Swiss-Prot record:
<dbReference type="Pfam" id="PF03966">
    <property type="entry name" value="Trm112p"/>
</dbReference>
<protein>
    <recommendedName>
        <fullName>UPF0434 protein Pfl01_4174</fullName>
    </recommendedName>
</protein>
<dbReference type="InterPro" id="IPR005651">
    <property type="entry name" value="Trm112-like"/>
</dbReference>
<comment type="similarity">
    <text>Belongs to the UPF0434 family.</text>
</comment>
<dbReference type="GO" id="GO:0005829">
    <property type="term" value="C:cytosol"/>
</dbReference>
Length: 61
């Protein structure tokens, strides 16, 4: 996924910023507490496809 997209993409739930996960397989929304998967280089920005962040992930900066 092109990291330049992070400048223009926003979480569809809370409209907050997104962060690329360390392994580059998810876009993380701390505001919504969700992780959106990246499949074949394309972020899947659907709430129904996102997973809920764990407590540790929410607290991690």
């Amino acid at each position: 996924m092109d990291t330049k997209l992070l400048d223009i993409l926003a979480c569809p739930v809370c409209k907050g910023p997104l962060k690329l996960s360390a392994d580059k397989t998810e876009l993380i929304s701390k505001g919504a507490g969700l992780a959106y998967p990246i499949r074949d280089g394309i972020p899947v920005m659907l709430e129904s496809e996102a997973r809920t962040l764990t407590t540790d992930e929410r607290l991690d900066k």
